[in-house]
């Protein structure tokens, strides 16, 4: 892809993506064993996170990474846009797509328990291009709720697509 097309695509995406609702949703089933294994693999020893199922454990805060990454790689491929009368994907070259960061907000959220089914939906926030590299960056604003429609977490995930990939 030549520089002019990359620049044209960047301008298009910076105009179209902000505040756009991302189609679809991502679901994650929270299983006791996976929650405990996740906590143990990062060295957590607090019984609140690794105790028996009968003790009523909750997911450790780091467990948010597991559902955030699933949401990222489930939702982004579903983004379809109409550019110059042609339908296109957000990431034209999926191997140039990169998950860059997460910022978690647990304010007014309930803890995750074994058996919960998490549902993530998102919109795009700010979108910009690093001029020198022509790498496109975007904020993906995720809202994650459980099966009871209770807020579990709000996440700002970073999306980057290398030049030629968008």
For each predicted feature, which ranges?
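Hot-dog-fold acyl-thioester-processing enzymes
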Residues: 1-101, 166
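HotDog/MaoC-like acyl-thioester-processing domains
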Residues: 1-16, 101-166
């Amino acid at each position: 892809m030549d520089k002019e097309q990359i620049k044209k695509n960047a301008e298009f995406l910076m105009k179209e993506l902000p505040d756009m609702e991302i189609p679809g949703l991502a679901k994650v089933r929270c299983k006791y064993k996976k929650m405990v294994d996740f906590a143990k693999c990062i060295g957590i020893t607090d019984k609140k996170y690794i105790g028996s199922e009968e003790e009523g454990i909750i997911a450790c805060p780091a467990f948010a990474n597991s559902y955030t990454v699933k949401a990222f790689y489930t939702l982004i491929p579903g983004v379809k846009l109409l550019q110059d009368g042609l339908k296109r994907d957000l990431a034209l070259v999926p191997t140039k797509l990169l998950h860059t960061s997460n910022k978690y907000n647990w304010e007014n959220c309930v803890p995750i328990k074994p058996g919960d089914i998490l549902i993530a939906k998102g919109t795009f926030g700010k979108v910009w291009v690093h001029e020198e590299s022509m790498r496109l960056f975007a904020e993906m604003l995720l809202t994650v709720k459980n099966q009871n429609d209770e807020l579990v977490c709000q996440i700002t995930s970073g999306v980057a697509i290398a030049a030629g990939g968008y």
